[in-house]
């Protein structure tokens, strides 16, 4: 699986790539990461990626052109046609059913866009985004944490990532778990 992550904070993904099952998947060549900082596609000397909301209101909005250029670069780098996913509190809730659906589509390339500030320019969503994804009915500071949740959940679906291939079929949220040592009580 190929992942292009558009983020203002690429360093946040180093721990995900360096530890746990995602690290194992990266080291075994099952997942490939590319990180794209929108600031690298900004056109001004200040590398500005946000602007005031047209019509006013609090907070800043991520600029259309900067995000579009980052996604276009990621699309060009992707080994196969990539599905563009925007991490957004308005999106479809990321749950086991959605993960299974996306993995069943056999899409092997995803571009994850991590929003910040008040959000992203709606023109970017309309033109570039295939699906908005939310990790729940609350707001976090940016799309990086939801993107990491998506990456971890999707990586569990890849053959060879988990130690036991049956682990992804019987996820632990469906039943109570106990260890075999009753003496611990």
Task: Give, region by region, the residue ranges found by the protein language model.
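Short, solvent-exposed amphipathic alpha-helical segments in soluble enzyme
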Residues: 20-24, 100-104, 128
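S-adenosyl-L-methionine/SAH cofactor-binding core of RNA-modifying enzymes
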Residues: 63-114
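N-terminal nucleotide/polyanion-binding subdomain common to many enzyme families
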Residues: 1-75
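Thiamine diphosphate
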Residues: 171-177
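A short acidic, often aromatic-flanked loop/helix-cap motif at beta-alpha or helix-coil junctions
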Residues: 39-44, 92, 139-141
């Amino acid at each position: 699986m190929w992942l292009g992550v558009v983020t203002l904070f690429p360093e946040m993904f180093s721990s995900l790539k360096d530890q746990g099952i995602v690290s194992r998947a990266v080291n075994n060549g099952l997942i490939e990461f590319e990180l794209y900082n929108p600031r690298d596609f900004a056109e001004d000397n200040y590398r500005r990626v946000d602007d005031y909301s047209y019509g006013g209101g609090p907070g800043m909005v991520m600029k259309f052109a900067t995000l579009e250029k980052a996604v276009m670069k990621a699309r060009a780098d992707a080994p196969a046609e990539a599905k563009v996913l925007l991490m957004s509190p308005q999106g479809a809730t990321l749950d086991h059913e959605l993960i299974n659906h996306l993995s069943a589509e056999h899409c092997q390339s995803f571009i994850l866009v991590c929003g910040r500030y008040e959000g992203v320019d709606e023109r970017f969503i309309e033109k570039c985004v295939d699906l908005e994804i939310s990790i729940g009915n609350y707001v976090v500071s940016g799309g990086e944490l939801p993107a990491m949740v998506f990456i971890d959940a999707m990586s569990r679906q890849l053959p060879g990532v988990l130690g036991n291939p049956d682990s992804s079929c019987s996820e632990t949220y469906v039943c109570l778990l106990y260890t075999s040592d009753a003496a611990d009580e």
